[in-house]
């Protein structure tokens, strides 16, 4: 399973690459290769200066020599364009969380420099220069927010072991290494209901973040929140600087507290008493935004906790004085992301996830009227200031880039991947609609090889998106589990790829998503197989050369499908599981399991039912490649290990690939490329190539 994840990772663009942005007008285009991953650059964390004159963002890439990823800070002028490429402001150690200072002259960011030290806060001139370290603290800074006057910064910190928060310049790296070594040598004491999280590991009391107030001029730091039972994050200053709103929850509480977020307010002063504003429920990352007049706060709100795994976040506003909440987008029946107030405070802009797209929209507070700000696009992040709106946008043929959104149209402000994409003959992507076995209308996309010939039947791969609360979109996403890149890789090597948004997916409303509640592996499989039948009926797919695969819930559904149908000649199950009993208490979804399936000792037959790929492994005939990271707490690799062992025992061709030190999303460059190579080799071994 996989929570919606929209933030992307990838390293600095060099001067040589900037110089190579001219289109390759005469050079023949070629197929995408696994090695191209080293040249892709991912753009993320978009920020806009208060005057709307500039944007800041991260550009992440992979370094072949060190086998690591690094994110660099970039800045671009609003008045520029793709022909006026932005400029890199940092190099060397990776950075995160860029933010403009209130006066717009500087950009702050987080970084662990030197490597291995605690993450601290840094500042650099907006136009470049040497960065300056703002904090030298005995703990990790994981987030922060400037006060409107620039005099203070609220820090989100964890791992603070003693009462003396402030450290000494030049000593942080050594102290950090000692503390980390000590932590690794001691037993971990756990008391949280959900006690583990992918990439974070085991959730101890020391890992719970709290808020601290930094005086920018003096460097003094004082605690704002300190309840050991709570975890505090996402601080946002009110426009007048008198209050800080933040998100808090109780990981040390019982089952009744699990998954509950609360929005609190506190004055930015040592000893101030926090006030709880409201409770909310959303399984995805919370996002707070103050109205310009400081009277209300926009945030994301879920529906019934019972449907935690299928929640489509609504946009809501809460009155600061009373806590009264108004849901602004409930009637849309679609998930929203990245809300931001317009400069005049009359409206909120956001992005809507809808049937293969994610487009920008606006809701007028006075009337509740919702209008589209653009169609047929995929927008992952949105920033607005001084009447300007910038977005991170992607399409089937374009990786995520920074764009100005003007009158419903995109104006490029970056083109980090243009040189590479100009070399590649990308596959075409077409929408298709078909009917599942019970008459339900299902939507998806067919990805055809660049040299596709109508009337020829092609080896066809059903590549399944993760989730289930997610969807295949018209995008070229460059992330560790990104189906859009994988389907391009397969298609440019001669395969037709089917992307089916099965029941359980988001993008078509709550009822469509909740159809599979407590009934995994049935309606989704019917939808997937019906998509294959449709492609065969259309004369596109070769019925004798079919394959299936996916990562996360895509891997789980692969296990379900090959245990239900023997037509597939090859399968790839990445970060999947065929025995859900194995995952109870070993992954991070205890809240979802108990809400949806109940504990196994209460509903053993239901748990056995949703684990049928393992208990009926003797039905499987498909050669299957299993893969996963050995540190994955999202879908632990035990799920793949058990299925591998079952097929190995049954004599079905199979292989297990374990990536050491990797979580649910692979990040080590050589491992990513290894995975892509294995994908292609497995398909070629059992399907062959184009017709």
Model regions: which residues?
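Predominantly five- to eight-bladed beta-propeller fold
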Residues: 70-72, 158-214, 257-262, 312-314, ...
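Short beta-strand element of the alpha/beta-hydrolase
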Residues: 456-466
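Short loop/turn segments that connect beta-strands within beta-propeller blades
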Residues: 77-81, 125-129, 215-219, 267-271, ...
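Structural motif
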Residues: 66-72, 117-120, 164-167, 208-210, ...
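Active-site-proximal cap/loop segments of hydrolase catalytic domains
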Residues: 477, 483-493, 498-691
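Conserved beta-propeller blade repeats
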Residues: 40-55, 92-110, 130-131, 138-154, ...
């Amino acid at each position: 399973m996989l929570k919606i994840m929209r933030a992307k990772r990838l390293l600095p663009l060099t001067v040589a690459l900037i110089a190579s942005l001219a289109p390759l007008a005469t050079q023949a285009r070629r197929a995408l290769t696994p090695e191209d991953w080293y040249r892709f650059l991912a753009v993320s964390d978009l920020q806009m200066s208060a005057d709307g004159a500039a944007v800041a963002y991260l550009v992440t890439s992979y370094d072949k020599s060190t086998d690591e990823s690094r994110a660099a800070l970039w800045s671009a002028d609003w008045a520029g364009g793709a022909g006026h490429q932005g400029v890199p402001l940092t190099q060397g150690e990776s950075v995160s969380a860029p933010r403009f200072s209130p006066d717009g002259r500087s950009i702050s960011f987080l970084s662990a420099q030197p490597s291995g030290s605690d993450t601290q806060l840094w500042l650099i001139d907006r136009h470049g220069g040497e960065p300056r370290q703002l904090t030298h603290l005995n703990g990790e800074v994981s987030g922060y927010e400037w006060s409107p006057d620039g005099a203070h910064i609220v820090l989100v910190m964890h791992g603070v072991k003693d009462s003396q928060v402030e450290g000494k310049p030049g000593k942080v790296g050594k102290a950090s290494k000692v503390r980390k070594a000590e932590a690794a040598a001691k037993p971990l004491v756990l008391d949280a209901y959900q006690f583990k999280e992918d990439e974070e590991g085991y959730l101890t009391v020391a890992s719970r973040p709290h808020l601290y107030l930094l005086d920018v001029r003096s460097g003094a730091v004082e605690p704002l929140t300190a309840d050991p039972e709570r975890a505090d994050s996402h601080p946002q200053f009110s426009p007048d600087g008198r209050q800080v709103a933040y998100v808090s929850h109780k990981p040390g509480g019982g089952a009744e507290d699990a998954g509950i977020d609360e929005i609190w307010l506190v004055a930015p002063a040592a000893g101030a008493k926090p006030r709880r504003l409201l409770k909310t429920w959303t399984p995805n990352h919370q996002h707070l935004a103050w109205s310009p007049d400081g009277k209300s706060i926009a945030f994301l709100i879920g529906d019934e906790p019972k449907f935690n795994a299928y929640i489509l976040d609504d946009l809501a506003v809460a009155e600061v004085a009373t806590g009264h909440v108004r849901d602004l987008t409930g009637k849309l029946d679609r998930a929203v992301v990245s809300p931001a107030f317009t400069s005049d405070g009359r409206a909120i802009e956001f992005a809507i996830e809808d049937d293969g797209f994610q487009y920008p929209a606006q809701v007028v507070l006075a009337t509740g009227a919702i209008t589209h700000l653009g169609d047929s696009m995929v927008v992952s992040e949105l920033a607005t200031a001084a009447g300007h709106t910038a977005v991170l946008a992607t399409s089937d043929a374009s990786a995520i880039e920074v764009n100005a959104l003007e009158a419903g149209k995109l104006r490029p402000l970056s083109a980090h991947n243009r040189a590479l994409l100009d070399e590649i003959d990308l596959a075409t992507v077409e929408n298709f609609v078909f009917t599942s076995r019970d008459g339900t209308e299902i939507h998806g996309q067919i990805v055809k090889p660049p040299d596709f010939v109508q009337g020829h039947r092609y080896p066809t791969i059903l590549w399944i998106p993760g989730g289930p609360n997610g969807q295949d979109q018209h995008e070229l996403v460059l992330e560790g589990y990104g189906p859009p890149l994988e389907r391009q890789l397969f298609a440019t090597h001669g395969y037709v790829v089917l992307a089916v948004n099965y029941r359980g997916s988001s993008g078509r409303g709550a009822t469509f998503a909740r159809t599979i509640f407590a009934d995994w592996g049935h309606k989704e499989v019917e939808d997937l197989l019906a998509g294959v039948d449709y492609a065969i009926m259309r004369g596109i797919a070769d019925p004798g050369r079919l394959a299936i695969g996916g990562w996360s819930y895509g891997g789980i559904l692969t296990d379900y499908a090959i245990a239900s149908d023997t037509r597939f000649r090859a399968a790839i199950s990445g970060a999947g599981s065929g025995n859900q009993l194995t995952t109870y208490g070993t992954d991070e979804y205890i809240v979802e399991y108990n809400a949806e399936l109940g504990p196994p000792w209460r509903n053993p037959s239901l748990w056995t039912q949703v684990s049928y790929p393992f208990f009926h492994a003797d039905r499987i005939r498909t050669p299957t490649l299993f893969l996963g990271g050995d540190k994955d707490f999202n879908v632990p690799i035990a799920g793949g290990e058990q299925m591998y062992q079952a097929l190995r025992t049954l004599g079905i061709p199979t292989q297990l690939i374990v990536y050491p030190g990797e979580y649910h999303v692979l990040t080590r460059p050589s491992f990513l490329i290894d995975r892509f190579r294995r994908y292609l080799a497995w398909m070629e071994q059992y399907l062959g190539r184009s017709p």
